[in-house]
Design a protein with these regions (language model features):
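Alpha-helical scaffold segments
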Residues: 1-128, 132-133, 137, 141
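Mixed-charge, Lys/Arg-enriched low-complexity segments
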Residues: 142-148
Length: 148
């Protein structure tokens, strides 16, 4: 079987599909019509794998951005609810993603720091890479945090 050949639902049992995506989440692109259960497992491992899923449900979209806010960039048509709970903010040096679900604390994705709490973000601003004194963008980050 060619590596890029689609694997039909009849050819591969659900357990085998689960094992394939467990090994490598991007293998979902070779599974024809993966179930929502499989889609959820994949995006919970790696939010970026949503790029391999055609027409993901709102729940799959939500799980992808909960895993990594940057995943919003890989959703072709995010639902209106998804658009309403994530802000994409461009700063002088990078993009910041803020996930603000109702009744939950906002979560920030900044660079490789995925879905960190407000307190974690503030701690990083003051303590990493020399703090406010050595990084001119830190004040910009604090200004963003104040909005949430």
């Amino acid at each position: 079987m060619e590596e890029r050949e689609l694997i039909s639902s009849n050819q591969m049992r659900e357990e085998a599909k689960l094992e394939a995506i467990k090994q490598n989440g991007y293998a979902i692109r070779y599974i024809d019509n993966p179930s929502e259960e499989i889609q959820l497992k994949v995006v919970r491992q790696n939010g970026y794998t949503i790029s391999c899923i055609k027409n993901p449900s709102e729940q799959v979209q939500l799980e992808a951005i909960r895993q990594d806010g940057c995943a919003i960039e890989y959703i072709n048509n995010p639902s209106s609810y998804i658009k309403s709970i994530i802000d994409v903010l461009d700063t002088s040096n990078r993009r910041i993603y803020v996930l603000h679900e109702p009744n939950n604390e906002p979560l920030f994705t900044v660079g490789c720091q995925c879905n960190i709490t407000k307190n974690d973000f503030i701690w990083r601003i003051y303590n990493l890479d020399g703090g406010l004194e050595e990084n001119p963008y830190r004040q910009e980050y604090l200004d963003i945090i104040e909005r949430y």
